[in-house]
């Protein structure tokens, strides 16, 4: 989904809260009781069931009995551009790879978000014209017709109806088909459906991940009845979470064979590879496209001079565009008679060049001027960071929603192409449950966007300060923990899904090192490629990859809203030993990291086993987080560098651990007038670290 400003999401109500914070900071330390540090990872019933079944385990890798549903779609759809109506037929072959028989089938009907009874999240935009939702007019399972009349409500004393035909019951954005005979484990079934819906018009704002501008441009997504995920985690198997328009999706992987019938003269961008270019593109357009992979230049393939049937496309009334996508979790498309087409390439390490296409309105050429280079850099950089881009093409399409991702296609303005391209890794390649755990795709993506931006600028990633900034909001009563269902995260959904994960990963870098974090996440990405990792798989995988027991870390960051709130309480010197009393008033522990700044001249600085000399007069000294596991809130750090004068000591000098008041991290304390100055902020809205 669209890139969100970390500044807007992290610096919330700081000025309004200042008086209360000042009182809290002035309170006696005795107000904070000794703390018991929780060091295990809480396990819910669903993950315990998966462990017991052997589908997942504490290695963090897919278990020996891991399985997932597989869905193959064959879809034919027609767009009535004047009416804005899409009519379709689908045939879905579903492979049940589980040990469980299916007594029901659950379908996703996400277009009902726009229907009269759609339950929409509070932050869903109101620029959308409501429709009648999706109208399913025919449905069969293995050739047996499904009765589309909702079943009568049960009345006490009335015997249940005999299951002569499968029954169909719609609950807003999902439908349950109750089967008269269970579908066998390790078997397959075929579902066929006919449906139609009106694409919602968008005026004066943005769409909810799709929409139409007038009757000349359509972004089409969440547009076909989709078989819901059936996995090893839920009791009963099926994902029945409602689509509310804020949190996103959870999809099966499978194969898509899709034919789209649109007016001649309209260009189509879609998930997958176009199978019939000779039938839908004019010879001159195909000839220009034949040079796409020859260089990094952006080629102008279709210009306004090519608008209309018989120019960019063959003449006639209508054309059918045929796309095929292997191993994808969804299919989306966009079409317009006003699109121009630019083309370039990205060179993927180990794979070679892949085509990158951009379909946009001529009036938006300034916004799209850098779309090609941005998308190229994103695909190449993230391929090296995590793993090679998994798909054969990427298409960016203009339209009412300027920041939404689908496999191989992005509804995006040029400025968001780096962020949206990152989603081709999560969740398009690692199929996480975005509806529940938005941080596993949006949050990870925000983190990698920080790295990508720095790479484009030939700078070091500005991760210092990111982790520390969480202390400014931690404990807010409106903040849901990251493990809380993102569908119901409330007013701080954006913070929970987008902002907190990069803070967490910055903090983890402060514990184990940024390069170690990125190496472990690359290994995690390879292990779960085209599978469905859960948060527990991620946590256990990272523990094993980093050779650390990080239960204390995961608990504080994911299951709670804790902060470190560390400080230097006292410094005293006797002989050649300086004792620094460090205090942590928050519930989250951290390693004790001190930057010790010496006078430029004086007696020799003696080495310490847990210290590294940064330069001739600065040492970085670290004690592991274990020093807090006994429950104390204070730790006496012994500095045994000899008799060289120490001029300054800073706790958490790289600003990685959540802290509300950073001024008490420094000894001696900053001057009062300096402390009153507002903190500088970097590009991502984070305080500039001055450690």
Where is each model-derived feature located?
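Surface-exposed beta-strand/loop patches in extracellular or lumenal glycoproteins
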Residues: 93-131, 244-248, 253-263, 536, ...
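Hydrophobic helix-coil surface modules that form long, contiguous segments used
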Residues: 227-238, 244-418, 446-447
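Solvent-exposed beta-hairpin/edge-strand motifs
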Residues: 102-158, 263-266, 597-610, 622
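A surface-exposed beta-strand-loop module
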Residues: 29-34, 85, 95, 101, ...
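Hydrophobic alpha-helical and helix-loop surface patches within well-folded domains
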Residues: 24, 38-51, 55, 70, ...
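Glycine/proline-rich low-complexity spacer/linker segments in large multi-domain proteins
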Residues: 117-130, 196-256, 277, 655-691
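Beta-strand-rich binding/interaction modules
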Residues: 269-270, 282, 334, 571-653
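Early extracytoplasmic/domain-onset interaction patches
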Residues: 27-108, 504
């Amino acid at each position: 989904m669209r890139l969100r400003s970390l500044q807007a999401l992290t610096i919330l109500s700081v000025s309004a809260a200042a008086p209360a914070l000042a009182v809290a900071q002035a309170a006696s330390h005795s107000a904070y009781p000794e703390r018991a540090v929780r060091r295990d990872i809480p396990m819910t019933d669903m993950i315990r069931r998966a462990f017991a079944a052997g589908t997942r385990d504490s290695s963090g890798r897919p278990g020996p009995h891991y399985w997932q549903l597989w869905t193959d779609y064959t879809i034919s759809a027609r767009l009535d551009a004047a009416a804005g109506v899409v009519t379709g037929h689908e045939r879905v072959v579903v492979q049940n790879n589980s040990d469980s028989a299916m007594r029901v089938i659950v379908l996703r009907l996400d277009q009902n978000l726009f229907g009269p009874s759609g339950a929409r999240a509070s932050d869903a935009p109101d620029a959308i014209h409501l429709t009648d939702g999706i109208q399913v007019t025919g449905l069969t399972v293995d050739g047996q017709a499904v009765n589309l009349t909702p079943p009568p409500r049960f009345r006490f004393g009335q015997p249940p109806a005999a299951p002569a035909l499968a029954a169909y019951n719609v609950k807003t954005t999902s439908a349950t088909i109750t089967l008269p005979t269970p579908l066998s484990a390790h078997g397959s079934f075929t579902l066929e459906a006919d449906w139609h819906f009106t694409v919602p018009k968008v005026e004066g704002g943005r769409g909810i991940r799709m929409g139409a501008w007038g009757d000349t441009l359509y972004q089409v997504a969440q547009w076909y009845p989709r078989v819901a995920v059936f996995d090893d985690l839920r009791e009963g198997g099926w994902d029945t979470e409602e689509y509310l328009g804020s949190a996103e999706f959870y999809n099966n992987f499978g194969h898509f064979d899709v034919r789209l019938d649109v007016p001649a003269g309209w260009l189509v961008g879609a998930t997958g590879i176009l199978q019939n270019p000779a039938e839908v593109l004019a010879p001159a357009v195909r000839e220009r496209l034949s040079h796409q992979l020859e260089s990094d230049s952006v080629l102008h393939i279709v210009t306004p001079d090519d608008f209309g049937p018989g120019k960019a496309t063959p003449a006639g009334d209508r054309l059918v565009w045929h796309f095929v996508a292997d191993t994808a979790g969804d299919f989306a498309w966009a079409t317009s008679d006003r699109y121009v087409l630019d083309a370039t390439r990205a060179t993927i390490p180990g794979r070679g060049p892949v085509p990158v296409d951009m379909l946009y309105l001529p009036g938006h050429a300034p916004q799209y001027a850098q779309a090609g280079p941005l998308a190229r850099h994103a695909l190449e950089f993230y391929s090296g960071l995590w793993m090679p881009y998994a798909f054969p093409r990427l298409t960016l399409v203009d339209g009412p929603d300027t920041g939404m991702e689908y496999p191989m296609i992005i509804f995006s303005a040029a400025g968001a192409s780096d962020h949206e391209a990152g989603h081709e890794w999560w969740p398009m390649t690692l199929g996480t449950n975005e509806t529940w755990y938005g941080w596993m795709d949006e949050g990870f993506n925000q983190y990698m966007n920080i790295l990508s931006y720095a790479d484009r600028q030939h700078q070091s990633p500005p991760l210092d300060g990111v982790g520390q900034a969480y202390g400014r909001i931690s404990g807010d009563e409106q903040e849901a923990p990251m493990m809380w269902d993102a569908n119901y995260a409330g007013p701080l959904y954006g913070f929970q899904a987008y902002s907190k994960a990069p803070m967490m990963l910055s903090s983890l870098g402060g514990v184990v090192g940024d390069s170690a974090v990125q190496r472990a996440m690359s290994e995690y990405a390879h292990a779960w490629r085209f599978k469905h990792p859960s948060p527990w798989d991620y946590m256990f995988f990272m523990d094993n990859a980093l050779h650390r027991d990080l239960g204390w870390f995961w608990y504080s960051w994911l299951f709670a809203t804790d902060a470190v709130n560390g400080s230097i309480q006292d410094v005293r010197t006797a002989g050649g030993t300086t004792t620094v009393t460090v205090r942590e008033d928050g519930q989250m522990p951290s390693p004790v990291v001190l930057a010790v700044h010496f006078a430029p001249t004086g007696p020799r600085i003696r080495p310490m086993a847990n210290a590294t000399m940064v330069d001739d007069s600065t040492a970085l000294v670290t004690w592991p987080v274990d020093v807090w596991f006994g429950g104390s809130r204070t730790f006496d750090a012994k500095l045994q560098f000899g008799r060289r004068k120490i001029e300054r000591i800073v706790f958490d000098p790289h600003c990685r651990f959540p802290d509300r008041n950073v001024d008490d991290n420094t000894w001696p304390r900053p001057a009062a007038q300096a402390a009153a100055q507002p903190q500088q902020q970097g590009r991502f809205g984070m305080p500039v670290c001055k450690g």
